[in-house]
Swiss-Prot record:
Role this protein plays: Involved in the degradation and recycling of damaged RNA. It is itself a target for degradation by the ATP-dependent protease Lon.
GO CC terms, sorted: cytoplasm
Statement: the UniProt record of this protein carries the keyword Repeat: no
Keywords: Cytoplasm, DNA-binding, Endonuclease, Hydrolase, Nuclease, RNA-binding
Top-level taxon in the UniProt lineage: Bacteria
Class of the enzyme per the UniProt entry, highest EC level: hydrolase
One Pfam family matching this protein: SymE_toxin
Gene Ontology MF terms: DNA binding; RNA binding; RNA endonuclease activity
Localisation per UniProt entry: Cytoplasm
HAMAP family the record matches: Endoribonucl_SymE
Protein's organism: Salmonella choleraesuis (strain SC-B67)
Family designation: Belongs to the SymE family.
Phylogenetic lineage: Bacteria, Pseudomonadati, Pseudomonadota, Gammaproteobacteria, Enterobacterales
Protein name per UniProt: Endoribonuclease SymE
Chief site of localization: cytoplasm
């Protein structure tokens, strides 16, 4: 049996009523058959306020009766050195050895 100390107290809701939005599923036409497919359009300044600025990548999780949209954090820009290493990794083994030899000479390790 549950003791009074293990019962969670009610807390404030995670989503306040002022943050709720009500939408209607509309439709879009699918060319060339012009069949109706369900569509939901989201727009408004509230999107930016919620962290969904223009150009933000969004993860979409779909469950029965529930869609969860999550803004992805922007990826940090890759340094010029890392971009160069990525290019070198695509070279042939012989060319990679030449690049490694050059790096060794510049670093004074050989």
């Amino acid at each position: 049996m549950t003791t009074p100390h293990s019962i969670a107290e009610s807390t404030d809701p995670e989503v306040f009523p002022a943050n709720n939005r009500h939408l209607t599923v509309s439709y879009a036409s699918s060319y060339p058959e012009y069949t109706r497919i369900p569509a939901i359009t989201l727009k408004g300044q509230w999107l930016e306020d919620a962290g969904f600025t223009t150009g933000t990548q969004v993860d979409v999780r779909v469950m029965n009766g529930c869609i969860v949209l999550t803004a992805q954090q922007p990826q940090p820009e890759e340094s010029e050195l890392m971009q160069s290493l990525r290019q070198v990794s695509k070279l042939s083994a012989r060319k990679q050895k030449q690049v490694q030899a050059f790096i060794d000479v510049m670093a004074g390790s050989k």
